[in-house]
Amino acid sequence: IGTRGSKLALWQAYYIEEKLQAAGATAEIIIIETKGDKILDRALSKIGSKGVFTEELEEQLLDGRIDIAVHSAKDLQSDLGDDFEVIAFTEREKINDVLVSRNKELDVHSGEPFVIGTSSTRRIAMLRAYFPHLKVVDMRGNLQTRIRKLDENHCDALLLAYAGVHRMGYHDMIIHE
């Protein structure tokens, strides 16, 4: 099983490993570092590559070093090409984004300005359209890195996918769903 090395990616891979072993299969986790993991000083939109989190996984699938790759569906390209297919999906978490912060007083509807970190082009566009009083900053890195940056005051809050926040146990930081 090929996967990225973040805590969230490993959580997902170990979850699949348990399911496979329960069905009688043997499995081994192989950690693969991707371009998206290595280049942290630029916005994803500036890296200029499709599959920034999947390309290295795909290479190892093609050359037989791994048999399957476990990955978040949100990072997959919409067209996988002829060489790959999605063979399974796990039960889906809630699909919404959540705002997380240590400051429970923040309110996006208050009209008061504050700084939100995210790396998603979709989330940035949504925030700018619906909450123009907020400042949005690019915030790259895995979930733990983003939480650390929040704690270091790089931003006041983070806009993240509920699934990752839930799986990594950061429920107490959710201030808006």
Per-range role (PLM):
Residues 1-177:
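Domain-level signature for soluble enzymes in the chorismate/prephenate branch of the shikimate pathway
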